[in-house]
Structure formats: structure tokens, C-alpha cells
């Protein structure tokens, strides 16, 4: 077996055999297949696709590249959630402690920023002292004592995916549906969770730009999970506009704490509660009330204990960028569009994301929104504030935001897109 023949098969729109898939995943994990060769194969997969048999085998090979975890020793059922990635998508941060407060155990293995979307681990690492890297023993201890853990997948869990995930981010192959589905589900199945809720984003700020592609991805992942014995359900949610009022690491942590304190933007609260209800139902927990757990402080208590158990200080001041630039409304009227993709790229260019997989991120960088679609604005009022430690980045970020919003005359009717577009089980 050689990698060139595998690349040629997919380049020429052929079906990869089980033997080819098993070999290339194993060889890439061991370093026999180089990054540039796997990049070529990933691009061929993006351009020519994979059928269900290939995707299932690719996922199984990724799982087989490492260990599998087991949570049978826990006294409560496990529930996990995964988002396909969006702009301002900080939902995992309030969601994990909220679901834990309602009686489930939440082993949330999360990732770094990918493309223009933020990464949960990058956000949490803006909290002084917080650790993303835990041993399996540490992870089980945090989960057992606080009910929730958010951490990086260990090197032993789907190591093939860890390498490929970073490679896709810097080779223009993030959007390949077979690679998205297998990446997510290999980690989640290997992780050993009993139930899984998928938040499949749709719109300009998502990797799935239209509802048809999002449904294909959701059905593929639900099928992979169900066939592996994991109770899996997917919500398709809107990502044409950023979630909440912030995009950036420390900015989003601050907003998440507001939600846990019983406040926060309405769209973030709505989606957090909806996903919590799905997770609790999938885990078989009846009569829990996520809204009550937000209101009575129990979700906040679980957050504080979870952060502290991973070395973080929940009371510490979060990093603030050294420089700010305010973008003002050019006219008065109704803000009818605010493009999530432009905001995501803008935040990324300010330093909230990476250009290369080894790049650091700026904890305080990002974009703070002062208006959302449907709001009335006045000429000259702040629309958004850009944050960065590197002022020369402002021009680059502003270019991404150009043409990314519309202001219609005052009195123009506005109909908001629902946050939840579909449910697939």
C-alpha cells in the first residue's frame, strides 16, 4: 500500500477501500504519511466526497487509532454536546455546568479555534490558571466531583483526528462534510459518552452555508452515533448572525458568566436552555428545569467549582486588549443584517484565532457588538468595538467587516430568523 495510490483513487472520484482507509489513517498517525500528502487527500475528499460506507470506515479507523474511554463507574448518566462551529458560539461554557446542575455528568472534550470560528479551549484558557490538558485520572476526578469537565482530548483519544484537525484548519479543507462528520464522531464515540446532542450551525458564519448541507451533515453524524450505540440527536441552528454580543476569547467568557448569573443576551440563553433540555432528555433525566437552575444560582455554582477544579480562578480579572477601535453606524434606521462570517474573520484577524496551527491567540482580542439585527440605530452611535493588542491589525479586520451589515430606513419591517431551524433524530 502506498499513499500516492490512495490519493489518486479519491482524486479520480473512486471509492476508497476499507484497506486503503485503515492503512492511510494508521500511516498518517505514525508519521509515515506526511502532512503535505494528507493535505492532498483531504482536498480530494473535499472536492469529490465520500459515500456512507467510506465515512463509517474512516470514522472507525480514527477511533481505532487510539484508546476508548468508559464512564460506567459514574453514578449519573453522561450527556455531551458538540457544535460544528460558529461565531460567538460560547454555548458550551454555560451549558456544561447547567446540565451538570440538573443531574447529568458532562464529559465535554473540546477543541481549538478552527478557521473563522472560536475554540472552547482557547476561550477558557483566558481564565488565569485554567488547564485544558488533564490526565484521564484528573478528568474523571473533576467529572465525579463537579459533574462537568471541559478539557482537551488526550493524546491517546483518536490521535489521527488530532493531527488531521489541525491540518484541515490551515489547508482550506475544514468544510469537507465527510471530514467534519468523522472528526466529530470519532472523538465523541471514543470518548464513551452515553448520549450526544449535536448543534449543527447553518448560515454565513457556519461551515455549512445552506440548510441542505447542514441536514446531510446532521443525518450522517446521527447515523454514525446511533450505529455505535450512542443516543444521538441534532439541532440545526442559525448562524447567519453572531451568537450573543461578543466574538473573542475573554470577551465570550465574560458573556458566559453573565448567562450563568441569570442575565446575558436572549439568543444565548434560549439556545443554552434548548440544548440543555435535549441533553437531559437524551440522558433519561426527567422533570429537570434548566431555566430554574440558571435563575437559582446552581448552574453558576457548578461553573465555579468546575473552573477551580481545573486550576482556574473563577474570580480573577479576565484579560483586556490594550487597544480598541469603535465602528459607528453610518446612517440612522434599522439594522437588518449583521454578517456572522465577517465578524468571525474580523475577530480572527484581530488575534482571536490562528493563521497557522502553532500560532498563539490573543486572549483579549475580538469584537464586541452594540446592536443586533432588528435594533434601531442612530447615525454615529457605536455598532461594534474592535479589541486587539496589535493596533496595526485594525485595518485588516475592518476590511473583513466592510459590507457586512445593512441599515434600512426607520420603520422598515424586520422578521428575525428563528434560532432553531430543525431537529434530526
Where are these predicted regions, by residue range?
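Short acidic, glycine/serine/threonine-rich loops at helix termini
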Residues: 92, 110, 117-122, 153-154, ...
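Glycine/serine-rich anion-binding loops at beta->alpha junctions
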Residues: 77-100, 104-117
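Acidic, glycine/proline-rich low-complexity segments that act as flexible tails and inter-domain linkers
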Residues: 1-88, 305-309, 420, 424-425
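Alpha-helix C-terminal capping segments
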Residues: 47-48, 94-107, 187-192, 227-228, ...
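Short beta-strand segments
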Residues: 109, 143, 151-153, 199-203, ...
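Phosphate/diphosphate-binding glycine-rich loops and adjacent basic-rich segments that engage nucleotide
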Residues: 144-193
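Well-ordered secondary-structure scaffolds
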Residues: 5, 10, 15-18, 28, ...
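A glycine-rich helix N-cap at a beta->alpha junction
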Residues: 123-149, 219-225, 229
